[in-house]
């Protein structure tokens, strides 16, 4: 299975970024924004070969003249025409493969509507003529990537966060909780609090700059109130950032106020529980006998769990909520930004997995509904 000609493809479609590559690799070959852009004005760009749409980085770089759309909202595909364009771009431009020659493993959000998985299956077999495909739940793949089959995954990306308890490889749907608070909201919040400092960021292009500031300078405080006091008393927490035009801005308490919203969604005007309470609530919805295993195997995954200090803070918060005798372990692997993809790469290259694929023959025989029988 090692040569590129027959290797399975693994495509993790996130709300913000699409990660794609070959099963057996240790990292995705292509990572690009999940966006499709269309020209705002017809016939404006002379001599540009006038494409009717652009995907990923190209859409990003031409964003000044395009209208950008994200076909995946809060982890769920909402625009199938644009999604097809993203998959087409993934196969033909990024990976440069013929999709009819490779099995493909796709990922889906927890609690993805049934009709959506059928539609994914249908597009793969009918539009791209895949020989075989499989749909796996993102959080389950992250758990596999950490070398476990039991645990609770906090998966937080750009568009949505989920807490997913998994026992012996199976997600427990009744205990999965979703929080519509993720990276994009934190970027927006940072834009807002930087405006209070007198820096104005408003356009979509400027939002990308703020996202970069967030990724480079933000961190989670172990004790928020104490950190606020430190920031007020001295400049020790201040950092400077150079904007593309050479202007240098200074940011202080914004560095930890931004990701604090994960623990205190009221900062964003949301009434939901913070990520620590959501993990706890998810565990409490599970059978009393497996809770101990979940507390001891709490795995973080996704780009929004990449803030320095987040694991220690999580440990502290969950310890405060859980029974005092219980052992709590937060696992935050360094590669967690891509752990969904890595889990997919591991799964698709296992010899025992080869009989799990849905083949073209099975699809032709049973139709899209086969996905519920073979992927669970």
From Swiss-Prot:
Entry's Gene Ontology molecular function annotations: ATP binding; hydrolase activity
Keyword Amino-acid biosynthesis: no
UniProt-annotated location(s): Cytoplasm, Cytoskeleton
Classification via PROSITE patterns: ACTINS_1, ACTINS_2, ACTINS_ACT_LIKE
UniProtKB keywords: Acetylation, ATP-binding, Cytoplasm, Cytoskeleton, Hydrolase, Nucleotide-binding, Oxidation
Chain positions with Methionine sulfoxide modification: 45, 48
Main subcellular location: cytoplasm
Prodomain residues: 1-2
Location of N-acetylaspartate modifications: 3
InterPro entries in UniProt: Actin (IPR004000), Actin/actin-like_CS (IPR020902), Actin_CS (IPR004001), ATPase_NBD (IPR043129)
Reactions performed catalytically: ATP + H2O = ADP + phosphate + H(+)
Domain of life (superkingdom): Eukaryota
EC number per UniProt: 3.6.4.-
PTM description: Oxidation of Met-45 to form methionine sulfoxide promotes actin filament depolymerization. Methionine sulfoxide is produced stereospecifically, but it is not known whether the (S)-S-oxide or the (R)-S-oxide is produced.
Record Pfam families: Actin (PF00022)
Extra remark: There are at least 5 different actin genes in this organism.
General function of this protein: Actins are highly conserved proteins that are involved in various types of cell motility and are ubiquitously expressed in all eukaryotic cells.
Family membership: Belongs to the actin family.
Subunit relationships: Polymerization of globular actin (G-actin) leads to a structural filament (F-actin) in the form of a two-stranded helix. Each actin can bind to 4 others.
Name of the featured protein: Actin, muscle-type A1
């Amino acid at each position: 299975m090692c040569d590129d000609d027959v290797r399975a493809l693994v495509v993790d479609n996130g709300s913000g970024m699409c990660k794609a590559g070959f099963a057996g690799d240790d990292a995705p070959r292509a990572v690009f924004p999940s966006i499709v852009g269309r020209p705002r004005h017809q016939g404006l760009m002379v001599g540009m070969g006038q494409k009717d749409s652009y995907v990923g980085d190209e859409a990003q770089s031409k964003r000044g003249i395009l209208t950008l759309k994200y076909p995946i909202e809060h982890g769920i595909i909402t625009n199938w025409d644009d999604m097809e364009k993203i998959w087409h771009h993934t196969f033909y431009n990024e990976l440069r493969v013929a999709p009819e020659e490779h099995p493909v493993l796709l990922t889906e959000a927890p609690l993805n509507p049934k009709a959506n998985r059928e539609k994914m299956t249908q597009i793969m077999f009918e539009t791209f003529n895949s020989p075989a495909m499989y749909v796996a739940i993102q959080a389950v793949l992250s758990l596999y990537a950490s070398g476990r089959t039991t645990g609770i995954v906090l998966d937080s990306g750009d568009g949505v966060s989920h807490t997913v308890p998994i026992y012996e490889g199976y997600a427990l749907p009744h205990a999965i909780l979703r929080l519509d608070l993720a990276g994009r909201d934190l970027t927006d919040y940072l834009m807002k609090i930087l405006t209070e400092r007198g820096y104005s960021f408003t356009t979509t292009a400027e939002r990308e700059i703020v996202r970069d500031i967030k990724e480079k300078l933000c961190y989670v405080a172990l004790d928020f109130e104490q950190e606020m006091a430190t920031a007020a008393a001295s400049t020790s927490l201040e950092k400077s950032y150079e904007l593309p035009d050479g202007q240098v801005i200074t940011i202080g308490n914004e560095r930890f106020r931004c990701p604090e919203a994960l623990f205190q969604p009221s900062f964003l005007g949301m009434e939901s529980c913070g990520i620590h309470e959501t993990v706890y609530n998810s565990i409490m919805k599970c059978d009393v006998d497996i809770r101990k295993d979940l507390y001891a195997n709490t795995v973080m995954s996704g780009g929004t769990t990449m803030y320095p200090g987040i694991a220690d803070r999580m440990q502290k918060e969950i310890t405060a909520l859980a029974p005092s005798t219980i052992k709590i372990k937060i696992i935050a692997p360094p590669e967690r930004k891509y752990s969904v993809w890595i889990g997919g790469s591991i799964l698709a290259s296992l010899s025992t997995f080869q009989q799990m694929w849905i083949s073209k023959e099975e699809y032709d025989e049973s139709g899209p509904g086969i996905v519920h029988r073979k992927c669970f």
